[in-house]
């Protein structure tokens, strides 16, 4: 297919961004246990913010490397500014990468629109002293969650309220959990991550990076809700069990931070509440921390050297890429 100079440049940029981001996404998943281990002494909230930031960073870094290095290098070396035949495989790869991003953005916009419509069906709020945002009662689902983006609301199901499933003290701790989600803008973070495509690598022992972030966000909200109080930790554990018994399988696609969004995390969260792990990694094992830092510096230096080598040979490689198929 014949394409003009600027369309060739657009295809090349799309392919470069897509390939680099996928490689960075795969690398992030591979090193995610090392990141979590390295941040062990920093606390749950620091881990949550790091996992959120690194997922955004894979896309930003892919764009920066493409537009600051690869595209200018191609423009400096390219002499043909007229139409040129481009391979169909290259065009298909560029179209697939564009569709990957477009699908993610469309999915996020759809969920946002459904959340707005769901908000409009809520009745009048009622007062709970512990709540920092308006509280509403819903028929069934979600049992207890923070719903919304710019003006989030806490929703509680009638089953939890009318059947007295939760004592007042337990309800206060659950509300404190949702208050933490509201203060840390976890729904906004979820929307931003939903706007971006993810490779979604996972195994039975290691979930995807997105799921790891979601689990860390819940653990961080648990910690904010209970603080150092063993009594509040027990109350929140009991609340999680009560919510698990009332959770419906008919999940609506809305922006929400539910008290128990993933039932498979129930055991892990209860273990963290009842048997918190002391944060002694930085003090007790400085040698291991030094080895990890040295390894990270080595990997980073190797990646920079490899990328510099690719940039130096980028024009002939880009020509081969453009003529695939």
Features from the language model and the residues they span:
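Active-site scaffold of zinc-dependent metalloenzymes
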Residues: 142-168
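Hydrophobic or amphipathic, alpha-helical segments that drive membrane association/targeting
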Residues: 1-140, 165, 279-325
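Catalytic Zn2+-binding segment of zinc metalloproteases
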Residues: 178-201, 229
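Active-site His/Glu-centered metal-binding helix of metallohydrolases
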Residues: 175-183, 220, 224
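Loop-to-transmembrane-helix entry motif
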Residues: 53-57, 178-185, 277
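Short helix/loop segments within enzyme catalytic domains
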Residues: 27-28, 32, 114-120, 207-268, ...
């Amino acid at each position: 297919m014949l394409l003009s100079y600027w369309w060739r440049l657009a295809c090349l940029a799309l392919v470069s961004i897509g390939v680099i981001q996928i490689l960075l996404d795969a690398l992030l998943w591979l090193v995610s246990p090392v990141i979590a281990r390295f941040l062990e002494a920093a606390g749950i909230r620091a881990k949550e913010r790091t996992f959120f930031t690194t997922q955004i960073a894979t896309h930003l870094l892919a764009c920066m490397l493409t537009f600051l290095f690869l595209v200018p290098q191609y423009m400096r070396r390219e002499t043909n500014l007229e139409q040129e035949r481009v391979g169909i495989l290259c065009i298909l790869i560029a179209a697939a990468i564009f569709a990957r991003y477009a699908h993610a953005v469309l999915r996020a916009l759809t969920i946002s629109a459904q959340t707005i419509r769901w908000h409009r069906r809520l009745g009048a709020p009622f007062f709970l002293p512990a709540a920092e945002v308006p509280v509403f009662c819903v028929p069934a689902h979600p049992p207890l969650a923070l719903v919304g983006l710019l003006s989030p609301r806490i929703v509680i199901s009638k089953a939890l309220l009318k059947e007295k499933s939760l004592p007042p003290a337990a309800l206060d701790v659950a509300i404190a959990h949702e208050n933490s989600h509201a203060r840390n803008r976890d729904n906004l973070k979820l929307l931003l991550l939903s706007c971006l495509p993810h490779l979604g690598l996972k195994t039975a022992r290691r979930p995807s990076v997105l799921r790891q972030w979601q689990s860390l966000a819940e653990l961080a909200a648990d910690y904010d809700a209970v603080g150092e109080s063993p009594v509040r930790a027990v109350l929140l554990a009991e609340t999680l069990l009560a919510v698990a018994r009332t959770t419906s399988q008919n999940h609506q696609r809305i922006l929400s931070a539910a008290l128990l969004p993933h039932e498979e995390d129930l055991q892990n969260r209860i273990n963290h509440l009842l048997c918190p792990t002391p944060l002694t990694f930085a003090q007790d094992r400085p040698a291991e921390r030094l080895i990890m830092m040295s390894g990270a510096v080595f990997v980073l230096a190797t990646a920079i050297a490899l990328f510099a080598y690719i940039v130096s040979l980028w024009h002939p490689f880009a020509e081969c890429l453009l003529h695939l198929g």
